[in-house]
Each structure stands twice: as structure tokens, then as C-alpha cells.
């Protein structure tokens, strides 16, 4: 059943693939006709594989976000959850070697990757080893570990729109970024419990049915929060949705 559903969705990808592959990180939404015609794709919660990464421990917000997210998705029925942290004793150490190995690992019928840390236009910061995970390295790791399976990637960091590259825009993927390539994100100070983006993502998790709905609701939440707090140069969260994942449901939904 899963293979047949994915095959039907790949046909839709041929319609929207050119559009998705020729735009910059300010992604336009999929055409309404593509979303409307895409059948709902539901993967059993116990067939999802999750990789959660807190890349830095200079603020408690990063570990807090990952710890809470782990509890939430476990409550949704996800069992294969691997956590990486820059803080010893809170999970496997989030250095480039460990995170790369976790992303390369295969298994399950769908992949969920959530990474929160600092970042710049070259990639995602991993404090252990003071290394950067680049967009090309993430794309290659996902290609090997997740292949053509439905894949959802969230990068919660400054300038994280840099991960929505042409090679990464594949029909089976959803890529969610907390900020545009030329923008910073907020809420990673020593006094923050969560980053702004992580806070909104967690707040919107219960009300969404599909990953696309969750990303759009989170973006709206971030915009409202930044306006309320008087942020002058907003983060502008980004979203890419591959046509084969247009109506991919969250685990347990």
C-alpha cells in the first residue's frame, strides 16, 4: 500500500518538480491544484525514524527544544528516536561524525530530522569540534539514509534557508527553515527557554494534521511573536514542499 501511494505521488511530482527546482529559498507554495489532488500519505507512527540534534549548549534553549520535542513525538507513537546534544550526558555528542552517522543510518518507512543551533550561510553549527554541517553534506546524508522515503527536515537556526538548495529540493522531501538565507532567527539567549521558532513549532504541533500545515502555522506564529516583541528585521521562515509529500501526515494523524 505504501509503495502504491508513493508511486501515485511521484506522478504529481512531475507536474510540480520543475517549479520546485527553479526557485530560490523564498519558496512559493505548491499550486493549489497539486495540493488538492495529492492523496493523503500516512505512515504508521512506529515506522518513522527521528534524528533530533541540539548543536550548541551556549543557551539552554537548544537542549530544551529537543528534549520537549522528543517527549512529544514519543507520545505520538514514534519509537526510533536518536538524540544528539552538545551537552555530555543528554544524548550522543553532537559532533559532525556522530550526527553524520545518524543521518546516514537507514531504517523505517519515513524520516524526520530536527536540528536546532546557531548557523550562518555556510551551514549549521555543531559546538563539539566547532564544525559546520553544510547543506551539501546534509543532502548527501539524507540521500543515503532516507533515499526516496518521505523525509521531513527542520533546521532551526539563523540563515537556515541556505539548506533549501536546488539539489535538496526532491519530490519526497519537506524542508523547513527557521529563517531566510539572509536573516537571523531569535530566542537563543541564555535566558530563553526555547528559541522563538522551536517554541512556535511545539505550540502548533497538536493542531496540525500534515507537515505542511504545521510549517505554515509555525511560520504564522513566529511572525506574530516577532511583531509583538518589536523585531525590526523579521526572520522570515522558509518552506519547501515536494509534490510527493504535499499531504504527508504527521505520525499518528
Question: Where do the PLM segments sit?
Answer:
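A short, glycine/acidic-enriched catalytic loop
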Residues: 117-147
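Bacterial N-terminal signal peptides
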Residues: 9-18
Amino acid at each position: 500500500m505504501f509503495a502504491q501511494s508513493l508511486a501515485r505521488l511521484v506522478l504529481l511530482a512531475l507536474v510540480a518538480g520543475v517549479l520546485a527546482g527553479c526557485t530560490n529559498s523564498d519558496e512559493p507554495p505548491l499550486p493549489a491544484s497539486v495540493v488538492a489532488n495529492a492523496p493523503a500519505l500516512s505512515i504508521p507512527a512506529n515506522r518513522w525514524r527521528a534524528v533530533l540534534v541540539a548543536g550548541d549548549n551556549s543557551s539552554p534553549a537548544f537542549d530544551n527544544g529537543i528534549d520537549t520535542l522528543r517527549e512529544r513525538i514519543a507520545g505520538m507513537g514514534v519509537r526510533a528516536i536518536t538524540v544528539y546534544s552538545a551537552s555530555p550526558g543528554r544524548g550522543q555528542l553532537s559532533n559532525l561524525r556522530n550526527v553524520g552517522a545518524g543521518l546516514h543510518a537507514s531504517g523505517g518507512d519515513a524520516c524526520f530530522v530536527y536540528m536546532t543551533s546557531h548557523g550562518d550561510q555556510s551551514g549549521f553549527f555543531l559546538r563539539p569540534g566547532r564544525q559546520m554541517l553544510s547543506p551539501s553534506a546534509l543532502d548527501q546524508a539524507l540521500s543515503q539514509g532516507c533515499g526516496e522515503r518521505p523525509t521531513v527536515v527542520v533546521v532551526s537556526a539563523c540563515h537556515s534557508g541556505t539548506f533549501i538548495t536546488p539539489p535538496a529540493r526532491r519530490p519526497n522531501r519537506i524542508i523547513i527553515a527557521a529563517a531566510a538565507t539572509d536573516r537571523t532567527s531569535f530566542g537563543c539567549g541564555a535566558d530563553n527557554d526555547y528559541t522563538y521558532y522551536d517554541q512556535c513549532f511545539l505550540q502548533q504541533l497538536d493542531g496540525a494534521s500534515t507537515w505542511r500545515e504545521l510549517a505554515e502555522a509555525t511560520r504564522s506564529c513566529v511572525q506574530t511573536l516577532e511583531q509583538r516583541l518589536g523585531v525590526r528585521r523579521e526572520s522570515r521562515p522558509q518552506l519547501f514542499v515536494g509534490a510527493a509529500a504535499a499531504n504527508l501526515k504527521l505520525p499518528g494523524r
